[in-house]
Structures are given as C-alpha cells and as structure tokens.
Amino acid sequence: EAQLLLQRTPVDDPLDDAAAQALADELTALAPSAVVTGLPLGKYIGCAGSGSDRFVVKKLHIDRSFPGTGDLYGAVLIGSLIQGNALSAAADNAAEFVSLAIQNTPAEQDTRFGVWFEPLLPRLCPPRDF
C-alpha cells in the first residue's frame, strides 16, 4: 500500500532496515508522520515509522496468516498512543501484541476466525491504584 501511495509498482522483495526507513520517510511528504507495516525484512516482519519519531521495529516472521491482524495492530497502536507512548513504543507494543496473539492461536484453529487475542488483553491495561 505504501508503494501504491508513492505511485510505485508494488514489490514483495525483502528490504533491509535502511530501505524500510526510507519508505516510511518518503510517506512524510503526504502526512506529518507515517507507519508502514508488514514489511518483509528477511527472517523478520517489521514496520517502519517516520516523522518526529523515526524507527524500524522487527519481529520474527511467523509463517501463519490471519485476517484482522492489521486491524488489531492499528487498535493497539492507537491505544498505546492514547496512553502517552511515543509512536516508536506504540508501534513496538502493537507488533509484539499481534505476534503474541498469533503464537497464542492453536495450530489447528481455522485461520478464518482470526487470532486468539482475548486472553492477552490484560497486557494492554496498565496497573492502576484505586
């Protein structure tokens, strides 16, 4: 999608960290900050962000695909930003949560039903003193 926004032909070739960062940097011509997700980084899958907070986040690629993980990533990212985290920390939190949700989903689970993230929801709520 990022390559389409930049009017390029989409490619699935693996990127290195510098190319991932450059892709995010180029998107700041269209918006003040940007996060590009689903980047193939060799044995990792990652995201890169640009704007006032530049970063590359990598997680070990898990060879399973589920619908809804992009929506889950976005929800955790926004929630983490609302909690006051920097964009780089929010992106890392979201990537880690999605990775854990994929790992938490039984191998025999029909992928059409998405990942089992519900047991992990307490990880998203900071402890509070009442």
Language-model-detected regions and their locations in the chain:
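Glycine/charged-rich beta-loop-alpha catalytic/anionic-binding loops adjacent to active sites
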Residues: 52-62
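Short, small-residue alpha-helix embedded
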Residues: 64-87
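Phosphate-handling active-site elements
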Residues: 55-56, 80-94
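Fold-independent oxyanion-binding glycine-rich loops
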Residues: 8, 37-39, 59-60, 69, ...
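Conserved phosphate/ATP/ADP-binding segment of small-molecule kinases
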Residues: 1-54, 88
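Glycine-rich beta-alpha junction loops
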Residues: 1, 38-42, 60-63, 94-98
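Charged C-terminal helix
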Residues: 88-130
